[in-house]
């Protein structure tokens, strides 16, 4: 098998902790039940089943409360306590994704007779063995998610966590859940633009778009902030996940071209020939999307995810090998044991190294300056993209180092909103960040390879032109020879100004916007709006 036990443990832990963090952020759902504290309370407590497959959780009954401590009895006949600081997270969950005020005492959360789930805390005073055991108030998340980690050079799946608990649900959300990726699909739209001759500095008009879709009526996509920003470099469009820029870009390039690009990465069959596909309206699995990102990470070479390296029969004979390449210099009379082995690279190229490098640079900007800032690891090169769908039903973060590609999805199995201000940057990205931080010592990344022949010019991040002396907001941009921008370059979508009825006030072109400071983006807008 390809699974690495250490990485698998990290994946399970990062996913579980991330789901629990989200769940607690949305409040306390209340006690499992209540029971009368009569002479038979212990027998009544034993009738409750502990959470399946979650060994560190126990069922307990609240026996007595004080303002600072709840005293509990457990199913194994022992007793313990929950201190206020270990339940103060439990703000009451209200309707419509709202939560109540922070509790001020234990009685604001628990009452005698409540049946609850608890988790034992480490004994910080091990020198006092008879000290009553201390617990934290807990609840099992009703949200779920998935994480998968792939070696981008081979396609080997190194870790796969298909949900919070396999005992609770055997549904594997890595391979079986088909969900809308939202803005996580955007790198392939921007790659199509690069292949069409545009650059990360090409200006795209960020302005209202109205699309008449037969059978659906008018579709009016929006940026998350509801604001518009005027002509902005393509890099900004990806870093800040600007929907209006992406739609204009897709309309300019053509959705057929975009689907053709996505098809090389195994995603074309998931996209419909409509502009909504540019914002992630088609459904994918986490494994499909992460495999596509792995092809960006590895330099633009096609890979297929694999779970098995070799298969042997009961006599030890090899009957299957996933990688059938042979090192010709390693066998025969001319084999040199001192020379490192060289395996032929037979992988199909799916992206030109130049355009792939430009895209990776832009995706690094997502982590450094954009919607994925929560995964930033100082001094460690990472690239990726957030994704959040309409009404925040799905949250994604897919990203990579030079040696590891990781995808995270979070959502309810029966889709419903994750809540206000919840999305790829706030829900999925922290899970990715924790896993990547812990996995780095095992698979450290290196700077992404730069193909020869590119020209590097420092440009102004706001207007895409070569930086002038004194410009502060700049970025070192990579260009193919002859593509360095000038003031005479066209703005994609600028001709559509005449259809807006009036010029957009320049005061709305505010770069210090909510789109930039919120770690979230919205993708597919309701077509009936």
Predicted features along the sequence, with ranges:
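Short small-residue beta-strand/loop micro-motif enriched in glycine and branched aliphatics
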Residues: 168-171, 272, 415-419
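Structural recognition of the beta-strand scaffold that forms the well-ordered cores
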Residues: 148-149, 158-160, 202-203, 236, ...
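Extended, non-catalytic substrate-recognition/exosite surfaces adjacent to catalytic cores, especially
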Residues: 1-217, 221-223, 235, 278-290, ...
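Active-site Gly/Thr loop motif
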Residues: 357-387
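Active-site-proximal loop and beta-strand segments within enzyme catalytic domains
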Residues: 195-234, 239-243, 251-258, 264, ...
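Acidic/polar loop patches that form or flank catalytic/metal-binding clefts of enzymes
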Residues: 24, 199-206, 271, 302-307, ...
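Short coil/turn segments at secondary-structure boundaries
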Residues: 1, 23-32, 250-252, 260-264, ...
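Soluble, non-transmembrane domains of envelope/secretory-pathway proteins that act on or interact
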Residues: 37-44, 64-68, 76-77, 201-202, ...
């Amino acid at each position: 098998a390809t699974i690495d036990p250490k990485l698998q443990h990290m994946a399970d832990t990062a996913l579980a902790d991330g789901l629990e963090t989200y769940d607690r952020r949305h409040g306390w759902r209340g006690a499992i039940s209540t029971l009368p504290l009569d002479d038979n309370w212990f027998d009544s407590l034993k009738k409750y089943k502990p959470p399946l497959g979650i060994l560190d959780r126990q069922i307990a009954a609240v026996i007595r409360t004080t303002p600072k401590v709840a005293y509990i009895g457990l199913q194994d006949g022992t007793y313990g306590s929950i201190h206020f600081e270990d339940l103060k997270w439990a703000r009451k969950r209200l309707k419509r994704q709202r939560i109540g005020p922070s509790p001020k005492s234990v009685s604001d959360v628990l009452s005698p007779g409540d049946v609850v789930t608890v988790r034992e805390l480490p004994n910080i005073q091990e020198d006092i063995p008879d000290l009553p055991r201390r617990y934290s108030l807990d609840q099992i998340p009703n949200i779920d998610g998935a994480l998968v980690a792939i070696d981008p050079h081979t396609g080997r799946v190194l870790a796969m966590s298909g949900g919070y608990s396999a005992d609770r649900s055997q549904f594997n959300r890595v391979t079986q859940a088909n969900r809308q990726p939202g803005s996580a699909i955007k790198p392939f739209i921007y790659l199509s633009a690069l292949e069409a001759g545009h650059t990360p500095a090409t200006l795209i008009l960020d302005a209202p778009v109205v699309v008449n879709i037969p059978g659906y009526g008018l579709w009016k996509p929006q940026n998350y902030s509801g604001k518009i920003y005027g002509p902005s470099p393509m890099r900004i469009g990806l870093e800040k996940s600007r929907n209006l820029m992406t739609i204009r870009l897709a309309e300019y390039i053509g959705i057929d071209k975009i689907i053709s690009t996505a098809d090389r990465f195994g995603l074309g069959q998931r996209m419909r020939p409509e502009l909504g596909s540019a914002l992630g309206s088609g459904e994918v699995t986490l494994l499909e999307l992460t495999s596509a990102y792995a092809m960006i990470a590895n330099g633009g070479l096609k890979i297929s995810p694999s779970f098995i390296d070799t298969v042997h029969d009961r006599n030890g004979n090899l009957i299957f090998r996933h990688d059938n390449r042979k090192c010709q210099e390693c066998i025969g009379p001319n084999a040199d044991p001192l020379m490192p082995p060289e395996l032929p690279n037979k992988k199909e190229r799916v992206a030109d190294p130049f355009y792939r490098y430009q895209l990776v640079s832009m995706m690094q900007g997502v982590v450094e300056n954009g919607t994925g800032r929560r995964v930033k690891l100082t001094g460690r090169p990472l690239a990726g993209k957030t994704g959040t769908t309409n009404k925040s039903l799905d949250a994604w973060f897919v990203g990579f180092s030079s040696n590891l590609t990781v995808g995270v999805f979070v959502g309810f199995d029966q889709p419903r909103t994750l809540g206000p201000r919840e999305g790829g940057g706030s829900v999925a990205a922290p899970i990715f960040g924790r896993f990547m931080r812990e996995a780095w010592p095992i698979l450290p990344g290196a700077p992404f390879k730069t193909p020869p022949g590119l020209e590097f010019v420092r440009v102004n991040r706001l207007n895409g032109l070569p930086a002038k002396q004194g410009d502060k907001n700049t970025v070192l941009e990579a260009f193919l020879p002859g593509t360095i921008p000038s003031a005479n370059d066209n703005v994609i979508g600028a001709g559509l100004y005449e259809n807006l009825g009036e010029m957009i006030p320049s005061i709305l072109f505010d770069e210090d916007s909510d789109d930039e400071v919120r770690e979230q983006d919205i993708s597919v807008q309701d077509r009936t709006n």
